[in-house]
Amino acid sequence: MDRPAPLIAKGPNEIWSWDITYMKGPIRGQFYYLYLFMDIFSRKIVRHEVFELESMELSAEIVDKICKMEKIKKGQIILHSDNGGPMKGATMLATLQELGVMPSFSKAVS
């Protein structure tokens, strides 16, 4: 099986990478979730927010905000992530399609 070609950004706002990081809360078993989006060319953090839950709806809202804030045009950007639920959920994918953002996912390890 052939490996996919690596993603290479030649300038800012071409490829963003994002993930959700679990952060311990003040109470045992309580977590907060850091949503962080970074431009892979410039390493600029284009947005970060902390929430009390992890969801594809929140992910979609953040991407919509970022694209408006950064004035991203349809077909301009690739958004790379792992294969987590909030990254591949129907709401998130529909938002990406509406915005003209191309999703990219890490290859699953079998």
Name each model-derived stretch:
Residues 1-110:
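Charged DNA-binding/catalytic regions of mobile-element recombinases
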